[in-house]
Every structure is written in structure tokens, then in C-alpha cells.
Amino acid sequence: MIKSTIALPSFFIVLILALVNSVAASSSYAPVAISLPAFSKECLYYDMVTEDDSLAVGYQVLTGGNFEIDFDITAPDGSVITSEKQKKYSDFLLKSFGVGKYTFCFSNNYGTALKKVEITLEKEKTLTDEHEADVNNDDIIANNAVEEIDRNLNKITKTLNYLRAREWRNMSTVNSTESRLTWLSILIIIIIAVISIAQVLLIQFLFTGRQKNYV
């Protein structure tokens, strides 16, 4: 009974400390937003330190034209790991293809609109790897619980980012439609004015011609 009473607070202490570390690590991470002018290319770089490293890579086009871009990942040896064409968003879990610098390039080859792209680069890690020296069952249970919480938080974050990107794209579509409707209305007004003036001139010409004939 005494052992159970002592272990229970220890479990919660480990859980709280691990959760705080997880939240602190997550709060230090933030997505990067870049602007891609028409027919331009921007690249980001990331150094893999060990063979066991893995990187979560994601991007989504927030605004601009048809929201389509090209994306490719290049390994340190120069080989292309993946290449995507005309994509609006995507996610990858990149395992190490060798230690060195990885290149992530984004190209805007479709349309003439400036496109805003939000990019996420986040190193994947497990809390159990960081605490291999701790063999305590309470620590293992706490780490597993925090890992589950962290996975759920990541899912929620990705879902929210996706919904936010959809909102941005919908807003951009609405603004583009409003602009087109405005110009279409102006064009219709000009056409109506030209037709009205032409009708007046035609009627005036016909009546003027008849009066001359009668005279």
C-alpha cells in the first residue's frame, strides 16, 4: 500500500514533466510562409545529422491563381527523392537517405499570380528515445501517454492547418470572383452605353436624311 502511494505521485510528476517538455518542443516550432512570384523557384535546406533522423514535411498553397505548384526533394548526393507536379498541398515523412543537406524546392510554373505557400519542416522524435536510461515502469507509461497526446495534438494541428488553408483558398476565390464581376459589370455598362449612343446616332441620321429628301 505504501509502495502504491509513493508510485502514484511519481507517475504524475513524470507525466507532467514529459508533457511540459513536449509542449515546449512543439511551441518552438512554427510553419514558414514564402511567396512565389510567377515562374519562380524557392528552396529550403535541412541538415540530417544522423541516419536515424526523420523529418515531417508538409506544404499547402494559401493564395494565388489556381493554387498549383511543383515540389521536389533532393538528397545530399543530388538524387531526386520525390517530385510532384501541379499540387495544392501534400505531406511527407522523410526518412534519412544519408547524412547531409537536403533540398526542398517549390516552383510556381502555372499562371501569372503570386502564390503564398505555407511550409512545415519538423524533426520527428519519440520521447522514449530521449529517456532510454530510464527503465522505470512509471516513466515508460508516462512517456507512452505523452506520445499519444503528442500524436493527437499533431493530428489536430494538421487538421486545423488544412481547414485554414481551405479558408484562405476559398477567400481568394471569392475575391477573384468579385473582381471579375466588377470588371464584367463595367464592361456591360460600357457596351450598353455604346449601343445606346449608336442607336441615337442612327435614328438621328435616318430622320435627318428624310428631312433633306422632303425639302
UniProtKB/Swiss-Prot annotation:
Keyword Protein transport among UniProt keywords: yes
- Describe the protein's quaternary organization and the partners it interacts with: Associates with EMP24, ERV25 and ERP1.
Lineage at the top is: Eukaryota, Fungi, Dikarya, Ascomycota, Saccharomycotina
Top-level taxonomic group: Eukaryota
What are the UniProt keywords, alphabetically? Endoplasmic reticulum, ER-Golgi transport, Membrane, Protein transport, Signal, Transmembrane, Transmembrane helix, Transport
Topological domain spans for side Lumenal:
26-182
Tell me the function of this protein: Involved in vesicular protein trafficking.
Has keyword Iron-sulfur?
no
How is this protein annotated for GO cellular component? Answer: COPII-coated ER to Golgi transport vesicle; endoplasmic reticulum; endoplasmic reticulum membrane; endoplasmic reticulum-Golgi intermediate compartment; Golgi apparatus; Golgi-associated vesicle
What gene name is listed for this protein?
Answer: ERP2
> What protein name is recorded for this chain?
Protein ERP2
Can you tell me where the transmembrane regions are? 183-203
Instruction: Report the residue ranges that make up the GOLD domain in this protein.
Output: 41-123
Mind listing the GO biological process terms from this record?
Answer: endoplasmic reticulum to Golgi vesicle-mediated transport; Golgi organization; intracellular protein transport; protein retention in ER lumen; vesicle budding from membrane
Listed InterPro entries: Emp24-like, GOLD_dom, GOLD_dom_sf
Q: Where is the signal peptide?
A: 1-25
